A protein has these predicted regions:
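NAD(P)+-binding Rossmann beta1-loop-alpha1 motif at the extreme N-terminus of oxidoreductases
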Residues: 1-57, 61-64, 90, 126
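Rossmann-fold dinucleotide-binding core
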Residues: 10, 98-176
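Hydrophobic beta-strand scaffold residues
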Residues: 28, 48, 117-118, 159, ...
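Rossmann-fold NAD(P) dinucleotide-binding segment
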Residues: 52-64, 68-116
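Active-site-proximal catalytic alpha-helix in oxidoreductases
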Residues: 132-139, 160, 164-196, 205-219, ...
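Interdomain hinge/lid region at the active-site interface
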Residues: 169, 215-276
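NAD(P)-dependent dehydrogenase/reductase Rossmann-like domain
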Residues: 273-297
């Protein structure tokens, strides 16, 4: 009999997770408010459910990958939400990037119904998720984590248990803080090369193999070279949500973040320029506009 797992939220990340789980032999039961997402699930061989509650009643382990606070609260505690599902002992693997206090309220809500919510943000782009190249930062009930190891292995290359509930999100904020800076530094380096008269493809090829490289340089450098941002692995608009969360997290800790604060401005500029639905690599186009370069659209 196939192993069964649930998934709620079948966007860029959720779709990649769902497809990898199906490939690994899991029977996937899923739900998303978008018809196109449900169609993707069915096309991949998954089972469509009527609500988050329906998913939790059909699978003892449920992954949630959601775009924001409102979606999370609706999925957990709204009408037809996971907290209202019958049965006890279900585990919710919560992979979204959200404020810790929001997830903590969700944890309390499901715990009151005899269920467990793990705080498990993932590190990686949508393209990395598609090839199972994610790292999961797991926090919360360690015994529940052990019960979910096979599911985690179905969506990621590595799983890091980081302790008490909320530490997963803290790690994710730090990771995305660096992604924000490294992504912009990649764009800045390529624009510098362009203005120096160097071929962008050559700059990428040489620097990607140098001490100045980074994971973001290697992942987003190629799309910056071609200027193709319309098949996003993470959109500019979604990243603004993360910037707000990380900025508040650092401010609450009175932690100076001069590089992050400076970098964030260019993502806001990208959305203001109409690039909200594009990949965050489009921050390169923002810099090119400032530099007067018209190589890319």
């Amino acid at each position: 009999m196939a192993k069964r797992v649930g998934i709620v939220g079948i966007g860029i990340m959720g779709t990649a997770m769902m497809r990898n789980l199906v490939k690994d032999g899991f029977e996937v039961v899923g739900y998303d408010i978008a018809e196109q997402a449900m169609a993707r699930l069915a096309e991949a061989g998954g089972i469509t459910a009527a609500s988050p509650r329906d998913v939790a009643e059909k699978a003892d382990i449920v992954i949630t990958s959601l775009p924001g606070v409102d979606a999370f609260e609706q999925v957990i505690a709204g009408q037809g939400g996971i907290a209202s599902s019958n049965g006890k002992g279900q585990i919710v693997i919560e992979c979204s990037t959200l404020p810790i206090d929001v997830k903590a309220r969700g944890e309390v809500r499901v715990a009151a119904q005899g269920k467990i919510l793990l705080d498990c943000p993932v590190s990686g782009t949508g393209a990395q998720a598609a090839r199972k190249d994610l790292v999961v930062f797991v926090s919360g009930d360690e015994a529940a984590f052990e019960r979910c190891r096979e599911v985690f292995a179905g969506i990621s290359r590595a799983q890091k248990y980081v302790g008490t509930f909320g530490n997963g999100s803290r790690m994710k904020f730090i990771a995305n803080h660096l992604v924000t800076i490294h992504n912009l530094s990649t764009a800045e380096a390529l624009v510098l090369g362009e203005m120096a008269g160097l071929d962008p493809a050559l700059v990428y090829d040489v620097i990607a193999d140098s001490a100045g490289s980074s994971r973001m340089f290697q992942i987003r450098g190629p799309m910056m070279v071609t200027g193709q941002y319309d098949e996003p692995t993470a959109t500019m608009t979604t990243h603004l949500k993360d910037l707000d969360i990380i900025g508040k997290f650092a401010a609450d800790l009175h932690c100076p973040t001069p590089l992050f604060n400076t970098a964030a401005q260019y993502y806001y500029a990208g959305v203001a320029q109409g690039r909200g639905s594009q990949d965050t690599g489009a921050v390169c186009a923002v810099l090119e506009k400032l530099a007067g370069i018209e190589r890319k659209g």
